[in-house]
Amino acid sequence: MRLTQAPATTAAAGNPPHKLGFAAKTKAYIALTKPRVMELLLVTTLPTMIFAARGLPNIWLILATMIGGAFAAGSAGAFNCYIDRDIDKIMHRTEDRPLVTGAVTPREALVFSWALGILSIAILWFGANPLAGLLGIAAIFFYVVVYTLILKRRTAQNIVWGGVAGCMPVLIAWAAVTNKVEWPAIILFMVIFLWTPPHYWPLSMRYSEDYKAANVPMLGAVAGARIVSVQVVLYTWAMVVCSLLLIPLGHACIVYTVVAGAAGLWFLLEAHRLHSKASHDTVTNKSAMKVFHGSISYLTLLFVALAVDPFVGMPLMG
């Protein structure tokens, strides 16, 4: 895979005004990996492993999967920063990224991305199993090639299909424990797939002017609030229904069942509130961001319940 390097024109576009110290340089490399995105992905990994094992897996397997998964996500994030550095300098939300400020050069970022990606696959392959390694390759490929290079600047549905990369950690986690991909893993994959639009589209509403300036067709930048809110509601309904399929098909117990139902109902209400405000032309950045942050809370609650579930009670069905 060859990534074309866009020319840097100023110090802010990739030529640091002075040499950074070790601590500052390390901080810049960490920022390249998009640690907030990485944290969110890792929230799903350990609970999925616990649920797959119906208990606590081997500690070394947990470490290999978590570290390998984190490095894979970090590699994908760094590749994304490298490719998108031309539009990152236009958008206020991304103007402090290391390649924009010049804290890291494009060459350094590209070498770092490849090194981290190769290391991540090696850790997953040998620390877990080859299937986990192959799924790690698929995750990086989908985020870098399918989302960043192909979809992001071409379609308002970019994060729908590009979001597949964000679903891969649950498949990697399940495969690490069982050496196969089974129906419960596919259900969890679909939950995150359906969760992605209600998570990102409210954010695109908040930063619609940024995306317009960068000519990135995020739905919140190219469609009105009413259209976006309808899509958020529809995807949220599908997500909640999908999450409940884990009860009959994944042998979920009482903790997961209660939390999936209650958290799902709460997030549905938030999605419908957004739609109601959009319908009355009273939607604000604050109300859009409330749904964005609510989506993170929902996913966190769901996967915490998934981790606790095997230790409490018996499966309700199956």
UniProtKB/Swiss-Prot annotation:
CDD domains: PT_UbiA_Cox10 (cd13957). GO terms for molecular function: protoheme IX farnesyltransferase activity. GO terms for cellular component: plasma membrane. It is a multi-pass membrane protein. Keywords: Cell membrane, Heme biosynthesis, Membrane, Transferase, Transmembrane, Transmembrane helix. GO terms for biological process: heme O biosynthetic process. The chain crosses the membrane at residues 37-57, 59-79, 108-128, 131-151, 158-178, 183-203, 216-238, 249-269, 296-316. It is found in: Cell membrane. InterPro entries: Protohaem_IX_farnesylTrfase, UbiA_prenyltransferase, UbiA_prenylTrfase_CS, UbiA_sf. Pathway: Porphyrin-containing compound metabolism; heme O biosynthesis; heme O from protoheme: step 1/1. Converts heme B (protoheme IX) to heme O by substitution of the vinyl group on carbon 2 of heme B porphyrin ring with a hydroxyethyl farnesyl side group. PANTHER family: 4-HYDROXYBENZOATE SOLANESYLTRANSFERASE, PROTOHEME IX FARNESYLTRANSFERASE, MITOCHONDRIAL. Carbon 2 of the heme B porphyrin ring is defined according to the Fischer nomenclature. This is Protoheme IX farnesyltransferase. The lineage of its organism: Bacteria, Bacillati, Actinomycetota, Actinomycetes, Micrococcales. The gene is ctaB.
